[in-house]
Amino acid sequence: MEEQLRVGGCSPDGGFTIVNEAPVADLLEFLHIDVELEHARDDREESARSKNVMRKQRNWERRLEVKKSKRKEEKLRKKLNRQDKDVSDAQLSKRVIKAITKERLEGARAAGLRLCVDLSMTEHLTHKEISRLAAQIRRLYGSNKKALQPFHVFLTELQEDSLLYKECVGMNDGFMHYLIDVTEESWFHLFPSEDVIYLTPDASEALESVEEDKIYILGGLVDETIHKKISYTKAKELGVRTARLPIDEYMVKKENPKNFHSKILAINQVFDILLTFRDTRDWTKALMAGIPPGKGFVLASAASKPLEET
């Protein structure tokens, strides 16, 4: 027989009159639902707080690693300068440079600003364009080796049995020993989407700065590719932020015999622009460092007869 909750009072004849009765199980179920809703609210709030704390913790750890890397680099430089006094200055200088370069690249892999080349779109490229892309990857790595503040470079969705991988190995001496991260995984599964900025010339937003806690994605397409908006479309489908280099904000079209103007850059050229901006915090210097004169653009301050943007 089901238990019941009796609520009542005394009747005129001294007896007990039941005013209301309800199954105890129903009341307990109602209370249980209320508690569950409260717990769910608490869990959501706690989850949001935890994510913020974890993000701050990761950023703090990355900054700490950068400081440690710089201190280690300085110690290594001093140590090498004290060693091998009988070695010629030229030999010692070469050894020091090589050791410091390695130390910087390892420090970047531990805590550097992350930049990824998205190599998932090679089906749109011809054999010739894939060879050009491999050459651009080589130049990109060469620039990173020379940088005062190298990036932590990722090559994503690069399969070992692909034509691009074979071109990279054949064209780039020591490619398999590059101090970068090469993976068959997609960048979308490696990084939090809210921290990603996909750089594409088709984006409406101009890149204002280079932030240490963001991940910058470059589409692995060469500047000869005729397909339009491939990387932009992919980024929008995945729901990540897109941005373009601020060419329109700092440069103008320059008259030339072919009337040729292009904002499509090789990945190593975009990389050089980001490296220079990170060192100088000056977009005019950065754009001048990476955009070849043949693209038909000059700095606004240097243009004598700029053409209007069409």
Swiss-Prot record:
Family: Belongs to the class IV-like SAM-binding methyltransferase superfamily. TRM10 family.
Record-annotated SAM-dependent MTase TRM10-type domain positions: 101-298
Coiled-coil intervals: 55-94
EC number(s) stated in the UniProt entry for this protein: 2.1.1.221
Gene: trmt10b
Gene Ontology CC: nucleoplasm; nucleus
Biological processes, Gene Ontology terms: tRNA N1-guanine methylation
InterPro entries, per database record: MT_TRM10-typ (IPR028564), MT_TRM10-typ_sf (IPR038459), Trm10_B_MTase_dom (IPR047911), tRNA_m1G_MeTrfase_euk (IPR007356), tRNA_MeTrfase_TRMD/TRM10 (IPR016009)
Sample GO molecular function, one term: tRNA (guanosine(9)-N1)-methyltransferase activity
Keyword Nuclease in record: no
Organism the protein comes from: Danio rerio
Catalytic reaction annotation: guanosine(9) in tRNA + S-adenosyl-L-methionine = N(1)-methylguanosine(9) in tRNA + S-adenosyl-L-homocysteine + H(+)
Annotated keywords: Coiled coil, Methyltransferase, S-adenosyl-L-methionine, Transferase
Function according to Swiss-Prot or TrEMBL: S-adenosyl-L-methionine-dependent guanine N(1)-methyltransferase that catalyzes the formation of N(1)-methylguanine at position 9 (m1G9) in tRNAs. Probably not able to catalyze formation of N(1)-methyladenine at position 9 (m1A9) in tRNAs.
Name of the featured protein: tRNA methyltransferase 10 homolog B
Keyword Methyltransferase in annotation: yes
